[in-house]
């Protein structure tokens, strides 16, 4: 008799669920996926499409997207051999984890953090060392360093600013972790453009164990293009590149990135708007007695309500989609929503005040 199909698969799959977005991805007011509320202007899309029209569609793209890597390296002011572009930062996460983890290797993950970290670590049969955030949802840098040393971890991943908490780890504390811990340290800066803290990109040259991860899905409004980057010391980057999927990024994504970087003032304007709205909404939420709101360094806010599931469904019934993040450690009855257009934000505020 043949074995059950599940017995032929990676045993880690038994402890992993398919990724899903509760509530779906369609709503009149969609604030559940931390997207930018601003699409690219039509005139830029026309320029991008005209350039892409001239590309050979029957040919593979470059093994690695060198045009995109050159453009982003120039933008950051780093060498090209310090940069790799990927098909979204999630693909880069898989690549980095493949390069750094194997059965028995130890990875330290602050909890809560982006759920994909744990999922990939489980798939690779690595040992996960979890370090809880403080009750305020802030990082505990001393505990991170202490546990990393005690457990002799091989790999540390830090989402800062953090998803789902919205909190940043102070830049000097990141530097301490990178310098004091005998481990590869991945700093996921998906939301860095919205943070009060500085990027740790400047540490790349002096810290051979540091990797910085970036996405173009948030501040650059390119979630649909799937563009991510890793930046690291060239010697480390050469190793990370080994498990990288070849031909994974399209020419279309490269061309789009080049145009957005050329007109970066549009990104700066959008970020300024989001930061202003974040502060306005935060102040409004502070005046609602039935909820607590947390300070944020991202393009989203976290609120704690008496009954998150009830409020979530009430919002959905009004055409407003947010994210229920109550399942995360320390985040019972918490909801997350990104900053939208002003009229969308006002609809959310009005509904929350009425509940």
UniProtKB/Swiss-Prot annotation:
The reaction(s) this protein catalyses: L-histidinol phosphate + 2-oxoglutarate = 3-(imidazol-4-yl)-2-oxopropyl phosphate + L-glutamate
Keyword terms, alphabetized: Amino-acid biosynthesis, Aminotransferase, Histidine biosynthesis, Pyridoxal phosphate, Transferase
InterPro entries, sorted: Aminotrans_II_pyridoxalP_BS (IPR001917), Aminotransferase_I/II_large (IPR004839), HisP_aminotrans (IPR005861), PyrdxlP-dep_Trfase (IPR015424), PyrdxlP-dep_Trfase_major (IPR015421), PyrdxlP-dep_Trfase_small (IPR015422)
Residue numbers carrying N6-(pyridoxal phosphate)lysine: 218
GO biological process: L-histidine biosynthetic process
GO MF: histidinol-phosphate transaminase activity; pyridoxal phosphate binding
PROSITE patterns reported for this sequence: AA_TRANSFER_CLASS_2
Pathway: Amino-acid biosynthesis; L-histidine biosynthesis; L-histidine from 5-phospho-alpha-D-ribose 1-diphosphate: step 7/9
CDD domains in the cross-refs: AAT_like
EC number(s) recorded for this UniProt protein: 2.6.1.9
Superkingdom of this protein's organism: Bacteria
Residues of the signal peptide: none
Entries under SUPFAM superfamilies matching the protein: PLP-dependent transferases
Class of the enzyme per the UniProt entry, highest EC level: transferase
Cofactor field: pyridoxal 5'-phosphate
Family label: Belongs to the class-II pyridoxal-phosphate-dependent aminotransferase family. Histidinol-phosphate aminotransferase subfamily.
Record note on quaternary structure: Homodimer.
Protein name in UniProt: Histidinol-phosphate aminotransferase
Organism annotation: Chlorobium limicola (strain DSM 245 / NBRC 103803 / 6330)
Organism placement in taxonomy: Bacteria, Pseudomonadati, Chlorobiota, Chlorobiia, Chlorobiales
């Amino acid at each position: 008799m043949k074995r059950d199909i599940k017995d032929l698969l990676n045993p880690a799959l038994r402890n992993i669920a398919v990724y899903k977005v509760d509530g779906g991805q369609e709503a009149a007011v969609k604030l559940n996926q931390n997207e930018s509320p601003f699409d690219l202007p039509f005139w830029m899309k026309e320029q991008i499409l005209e350039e892409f029209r001239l590309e050979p569609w029957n040919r593979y793209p470059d093994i690695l997207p060198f045009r995109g890597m050159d453009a982003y390296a120039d933008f950051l002011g780093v060498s090209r051999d310090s940069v790799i572009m990927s098909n979204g930062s999630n693909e880069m996460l898989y690549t980095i984890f493949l390069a750094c983890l194997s059965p028995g290797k130890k990875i330290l993950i602050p909890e809560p953090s982006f759920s994909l970290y744990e999922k990939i670590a489980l798939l690779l049969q690595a040992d996960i060392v979890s370090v809880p955030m403080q009750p305020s949802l802030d990082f505990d840098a001393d505990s991170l360093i202490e546990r990393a040393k005690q457990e002799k971890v091989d790999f540390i991943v830090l989402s800062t600013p953090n998803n789902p908490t919205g909190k940043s780890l102070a830049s000097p504390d990141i530097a301490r972790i990178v310098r004091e811990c005998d481990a590869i340290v991945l700093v996921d800066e998906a939301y860095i453009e919205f943070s009060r803290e500085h990027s740790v990109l400047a540490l790349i040259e002096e810290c051979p164990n540091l990797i910085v991860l970036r996405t173009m899905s948030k501040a650059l409004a390119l979630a649909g293009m799937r563009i991510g980057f890793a930046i690291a010391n060239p010697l480390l980057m050469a190793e990370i590149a080994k498990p990288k999927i070849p031909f994974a990024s399209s020419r279309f994504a490269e061309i789009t990135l080049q145009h957005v970087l050329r007109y970066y003032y549009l990104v700066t304007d959008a970020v300024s708007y989001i930061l202003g709205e974040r502060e306005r909404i935060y102040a409004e939420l502070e005046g609602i007695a039935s909820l607590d709101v947390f300070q944020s360094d991202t393009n989203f806010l976290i609120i704690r309500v008496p009954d998150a599931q009830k409020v979530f469904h009430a919002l959905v019934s009004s055409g407003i989609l947010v994210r229920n993040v109550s399942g995360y450690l320390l985040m019972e009855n918490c909801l997350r929503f990104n900053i939208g257009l002003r009229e969308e934000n006002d609809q959310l505020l009005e509904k929350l005040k009425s509940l």
